[in-house]
Amino acid sequence: VDGHIWVNGYKGGEMGVAYQVDFEANEWTPVIHPAGSPPHNAYDVMADSKNNMYGINMDKEHVWKTDAKTLKTTFFKIPTPGAGGRRGNVDSKDRLWWAQYRGNGIGMFDPVTEKITEWKMPTPWTSPYDAEFDEEAYVWTGGMNNDLAIRLNVETGEFTEYLLPFETNIRNVDVQMSDNPHKLSSFWVGGQLNGLITHVEPLVP
């Protein structure tokens, strides 16, 4: 969008430092937070359509957004204490969707209202790792601890769970739109433990 990318130091000497990187000029500009800011060591960073950066961490109480032009960061409190976030994605409306690994749920931050909406997993200890919205009605996630692919209808709040045929240890998930009559999305995941690729394709809503 603007010739920059975002890089975050998760561990080591620069743990918690995010950089806005200008490839053409080879300039790395650190994001400086004021004293007293909430913890901000991101496990995952994502950019919206204007290249503003979102940050999440599975052990933190906030999600945060850094303005691409001013580098000012705003923190937003997650309603469920300790829910955190592991991986996520930004949709076409610049909403952040993320998996609440510790909180066993899905979170969504709307930048227009600056409000966070949460949905709790129907099965305890699912430990969702990643979440992605399909731009229609469903958000997909996967259980790191129980090998469930999970589809949430965000309009009705209804969950559908699909037990995978073998141990997968789900991490990153990918959503694909379909040309079927119901415009249903499908779910792709790579097996962390088995080297296999699994595709879950619902045929009905």
Question: What residue spans do the PLM features occupy?
Answer:
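Beta-rich, blade/repeat-based domains predominating
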Residues: 1-3, 36-51, 80-95, 99, ...
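Conserved beta-strand positions in repeat-built beta-propeller and related beta-rich domains
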Residues: 7-13, 53-59, 96-102, 139-145, ...
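Solenoidal tandem-repeat scaffolds enriched in leucines and small polar residues
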Residues: 12, 18-23, 28-32, 37-68, ...
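A short loop-to-beta-strand structural motif that recurs across blades of beta-propeller domains
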Residues: 16-19, 62-65, 105-108, 147-150, ...
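Short loop/turn segments that connect beta-strands within beta-propeller blades
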Residues: 22-26, 67-71, 110-114, 153-157, ...
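A generic "binding-loop/recognition-motif" signal
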Residues: 24, 59, 69, 102-103, ...
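Beta-propeller fold detector
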Residues: 29-34, 74-78, 117-121, 160-164
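C-terminal closing repeat unit and adjoining cap/tail of repeat-based domains
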Residues: 145-193, 200-205
